[in-house]
Amino acid sequence: MERVLRVLEYEKMKKQLLEHVSSSLGRKKVEQLTPSTDFNKVKLWQAQTQEGANMLRLKGHVPLGGIFDIKPHLKRAKIGGLLHASELLEVASTIYGGRQLKKFIETMIEEEEADLPLLGEFARQIVPLTDLERAIKQCIDDNGHVLDSASPTLRTLRHQIRSFEANVRSKLEGITRSSNTAKMLSDAIVTIRNDRYVIPVKQEYRGAFGGIVHDQSASGATLFVEPQAVVEINNQLREAKAKEQREIERILSELSMQVSEHVDDLFVNVDVLAELDFIMARAHYGKAIRATQPILNNRGYLLIKQGRHPLIPDDEIVPIDIELGHSYSSLVITGPNTGGKTVTLKTIGLLTLMAQSGLHVPAEEESELAVFKHVFADIGDEQSIEQSLSTFSSHMTNIVDILGKVDHESLVLFDELGAGTDPTEGAALAIAILDDVYRRGARIVATTHYSELKGYAYNREGVMNASVEFDVETLSPTYRLLIGVPGRSNAFAISKRLGLEEKIIEQAKAHIDEDASQVESMIASLEQSQKSAESDWEEAEKALQEAEQLRLDLQKKLDDLEKEKERILAEAEQQAEQAVKDAKEEAEVIISELRDLQKQGVSVKEHQIIDAKKHLEEAAPKLTKQQKKVKRTAEKKREFKPGDEVKVLSFGQKGHIVEKVSEAEYQVQMGIMKMKVEASDLQLIDRPQPVETKPLATIRGSDHHVKPELDLRGERYEEAMLKVEKYLDDALLAGYASVSIIHGKGTGALRKGVKDLLKRHPHVKSARDGGANEGGLGNTVVELR
């Protein structure tokens, strides 16, 4: 397997993948990566990569910073070892990074931004460990330095150390600045030797300061002396620093103990973060090479659409289309050397290995790849040459090994099968090997430049010819794979283009037997036919795309027209509602003016009534379709008699017939107004049978009677409110000082609605619940003004 991974450049692909990891955890996972032969595992890996790609597509990034491989630290803490401050800081940073990633994934799931069942399960396994992180961060700063605030003792010791250091420096600087001692010093500085403060003294003044010599210069001319005056302070400083170190170790030991208490959770977190970093590296790499998730199968079927070798730059690669394992299980790619056949072979092999490693592949959507138990490749490489094997021996050694392992779950890639020996024998061997592997049910892709194998592909069921297109004009391969067309050597055409004399080419052709010449002509014809068919297909595809675009454009215009229609209808409806509102307000103003005249005892003249009617008619909105329908219904001939209660349809008001004026016109009393109304504008109102005799009031100037109470029981809320408004108007015109509105107790909704309406009514002086003998809470007594 190692050789296959090498010749198919799997390790080079992994180096590209390594560029996308975020931590040493992910790096280790990539370094350990090998293709899996377990179909279910490969499906799982692919699904994980797809979820990672979805997160990248939606968010653009995933927080994976600050994560370290802390397993060595955890193992040491578990056995009671002391962790250094920098190691504890890595533990805290990894806890924080894990918690941030957990929150990021779970937030996306909660907000339903993406369906992430696999990554969500990983996120759920991460233990937050906030208290442990906080404990470490309170003691250690971001540079790995233990803070003064880590303990009261440490704060005191550090204060003492700073005091001692300031004291000793002050004394030594006093010596260096003194004019009496300046000539004795090599330099006027204070420095440190053996963790003690010293000054540089010339050799000849060694005894001038007393104290201890800690070091000397390379020449011996300068001695680094700790003067006697600061020896005691330096001793105190050193002792304080020793105590400081012991206190730091105590703090680190305590924190290490806390880590050991959570070591199992931390191991889980590290494993989960390693997986998530690995998954996101695969997703990032897929994005970088414009890869897609392949469809997987375990039937040995390959369908690669516009597949690209990931190691070849985009501006140099020519995508390939290939199918294998359906109508044919062997593909023989023929043609001259250096024609791109090996690149095709490596692309098929590497994309298969990538898919079986959970990586998306650089190919178009709907590409399909099989999960093989074995992938074999006989492709020449430098290592075989270094082993001093001939080309033929190298190939044959590898082929013998392959034939000993190949089965129906294998993909076998042969490059230049049978090369390196006598062409006749080599071709015969190649055919025999292909037949043997085919009988075992393996999927085969083989390249060769032997003409004999072109005929082999035509004569065997389940075997297909293919070639890599070659441009004889530019004398270079186009690297386009042509399925169903065998390759030509193009030796004569190339030689002619390079300037070889025509007579030599003709002599060479004479040495080729007629059958071989006919085969070459047939292949040339096939190539031309295929090019023509592909050109026709491309034109048909273009026409189909143009037709589809036209359909989409027309659909958009239709949708736009529908939206415009809806907008116009909505605008018209809004205008109609406003017209009705304006008309109602105008009518209320006119009625209010007439009421005021009534209250003032002013006699309403006929011309005033006519003017009011005219204003009402002007205020009335244009009839809607529904109103027109009602009007047409009302236009049916009908007879009314004096006293009939009617509804005037154009005003929506009730009144009663005073007299018949003409064949199709009646005088109608509406409140204080009398007006002539066409019969078609009237609707008869059936009078209810009287239940009991109640005292009635008569509206002045009319024979319309108004009862002293209004019974709303059984009425719907909206209709009840309208009846209350009209009843109050009628009661005012009838001269009542107070009236009763019977609404019943029920749910209380009707009672509340009546109370609210009465509070807003300008002519209601007060309203109270009925007394014990007045119906109680089921009745409201209204005092009018």
Swiss-Prot record:
EC code(s) of this entry: 3.1.-.-, 3.6.4.-
Coiled coil ranges: none
Recorded superkingdom: Bacteria
GO-annotated biological processes: mismatch repair; negative regulation of DNA recombination; rescue of stalled ribosome
UniProt keyword Protein biosynthesis, yes or no: no
Listed InterPro entries: DNA_mismatch_repair_MutS_C, DNA_mismatch_repair_MutS_core, DNA_mismatch_repair_MutS_sf, MSSS, MutS, MutS2, P-loop_NTPase, Smr_dom
Region called Disordered, residue ranges: 764-785
Keywords: ATP-binding, DNA-binding, Endonuclease, Hydrolase, Nuclease, Nucleotide-binding, RNA-binding, rRNA-binding
Binding site for ATP: G335, P336, N337, T338, G339, G340, K341, T342
Keyword Cytoplasm listed: no
Signal sequence region: none
Domain Smr, chain residue ranges per copy: 710-785
GO molecular function: ATP binding; ATP hydrolysis activity; ATP-dependent DNA damage sensor activity; endonuclease activity; mismatched DNA binding; ribosomal large subunit binding; rRNA binding
Transmembrane portions of the chain: none
Pfam families named in the record: MSSS, MutS_V, Smr
The protein's assembly and partners: Homodimer. Binds to stalled ribosomes, contacting rRNA.
Assigned protein family: Belongs to the DNA mismatch repair MutS family. MutS2 subfamily.
HAMAP family according to UniProt: MutS2 (MF_00092)
Function statement: Endonuclease that is involved in the suppression of homologous recombination and thus may have a key role in the control of bacterial genetic diversity. Acts as a ribosome collision sensor, splitting the ribosome into its 2 subunits. Detects stalled/collided 70S ribosomes which it binds and splits by an ATP-hydrolysis driven conformational change. Acts upstream of the ribosome quality control system (RQC), a ribosome-associated complex that mediates the extraction of incompletely synthesized nascent chains from stalled ribosomes and their subsequent degradation. Probably generates substrates for RQC.
Protein name as catalogued: Endonuclease MutS2
Provenance organism: Halalkalibacterium halodurans (strain ATCC BAA-125 / DSM 18197 / FERM 7344 / JCM 9153 / C-125) (Bacillus halodurans)
Lineage: Bacteria, Bacillati, Bacillota, Bacilli, Bacillales
